[in-house]
Amino acid sequence: MRLLAGWLCLSLASVWLARRMWTLRSPLTRSLYVNMTSGPGGPAAAAGGRKENHQWYVCNREKLCESLQAVFVQSYLDQGTQIFLNNSIEKSGWLFIQLYHSFVSSVFSLFMSRTSINGLLGRGSMFVFSPDQFQRLLKINPDWKTHRLLDLGAGDGEVTKIMSPHFEEIYATELSETMIWQLQKKKYRVLGINEWQKTGFQYDVISCLNLLDRCDQPLTLLKDIRSVLEPTRGRVILALVLPFHPYVENVGGKWDKPSEILEIKGQNWEEQVNSLPEVFRKAGFVIEAFTRLPYLCEGDMYNDYYVLDDAVFVLKPV
């Protein structure tokens, strides 16, 4: 009887998903049609032209306060970024894999977060900076090496991999169990979210990349980072999507407001950057350098890739 009931439930779910995926008004159906009918010069190939991509790095320095003008580092579309874009565009054209990912995402979104689904499927990798951009921002050479890195909210570890050649020991934290699995496959030492503050040692570099707007207590997080950072040569590399829209992701894709609010003001990228020195000062940091970079994510059937505007800072303790 239980087997029959389970079979009926599965059948009903399959019918519902099929109707959802293949209705003539469905974005999935339209995307499939575009993939089948467009050639190499069609909409998918045309997405994200070179001229548009260069706009990702533009900063109006005249709108920055004087102290920030002095530490701004101009970045550019480089080879490492272009390789990520090319790979993402290629993957988005793998039609049957994208169909499979879409089906699995539809089913698993009922009881898993989008982050965990991506970790399970091994898709949706993020890109914050290339090796060259990382080195220019920290003012280090390719051979520079130090002892200990902590990457908070490391996701699948692809960004960690870019930083890892410069460190002898690499630690990471992550909430998603499937992302932890991805990190462990890369041989990184995964610490619990309440463990990294209590290891008894300090970190030479702590990365906090696009995490402050997705955690419940961003102010507490900044202060915890300060408490375990090596006090003289230690640095924090912190990325933040601007304009700032904080929320906390829960199972089923539900969004909640964080319990702590960062006082970030302004309507555009430059105005919001101007309010951040005071936010960092309250946590015990000053800005040593910063840049504007695209926060990229691998695409799917609908887009070759996704992009948001990042401000990436190097912070030093005071």
Curated annotation (Swiss-Prot):
InterPro entries reported in the protein's UniProt record: METL9 (IPR007884), SAM-dependent_MTases_sf (IPR029063)
Keyword NADP (UniProt): no
Keywords assigned: Endoplasmic reticulum, Glycoprotein, Methyltransferase, Mitochondrion, Signal, Transferase
SUPFAM superfamilies registered for this protein in UniProt: S-adenosyl-L-methionine-dependent methyltransferases
One GO BP annotation of this record: methylation
One Gene Ontology CC term in the entry: endoplasmic reticulum
Reaction(s) this enzyme catalyzes, per UniProt: L-histidyl-[protein] + S-adenosyl-L-methionine = N(pros)-methyl-L-histidyl-[protein] + S-adenosyl-L-homocysteine + H(+)
Single GO molecular function: protein-L-histidine N-pros-methyltransferase activity
Enzyme nomenclature, EC number: 2.1.1.-
Main location: endoplasmic reticulum
UniProt keyword Transferase present: yes
Signal sequence interval, chain numbering: 1-18
Residues annotated as glycosylated: 35
Amino acids binding S-adenosyl-L-homocysteine: 174, 210, 295
Organism superkingdom: Eukaryota
Subcellular location per the Swiss-Prot or TrEMBL entry: Endoplasmic reticulum; Mitochondrion
Gene3D superfamilies: Vaccinia Virus protein VP39
Pfam families, A to Z: DREV (PF05219)
Annotated function: Protein-histidine N-methyltransferase that specifically catalyzes 1-methylhistidine (pros-methylhistidine) methylation of target proteins. Specifically methylates the second His of proteins with a His-x-His (HxH) motif (where 'x' is preferably a small amino acid), while exploiting the first one as a recognition signature. Catalyzes methylation of target proteins such as S100A9, NDUFB3, SLC39A5, SLC39A7, ARMC6 and DNAJB12; 1-methylhistidine modification may affect the binding of zinc and other metals to its target proteins.
Family listed: Belongs to the METTL9 family.
Protein name, UniProt field: Protein-L-histidine N-pros-methyltransferase
Organism: Bos taurus (Bovine)
UniProt gene name: METTL9
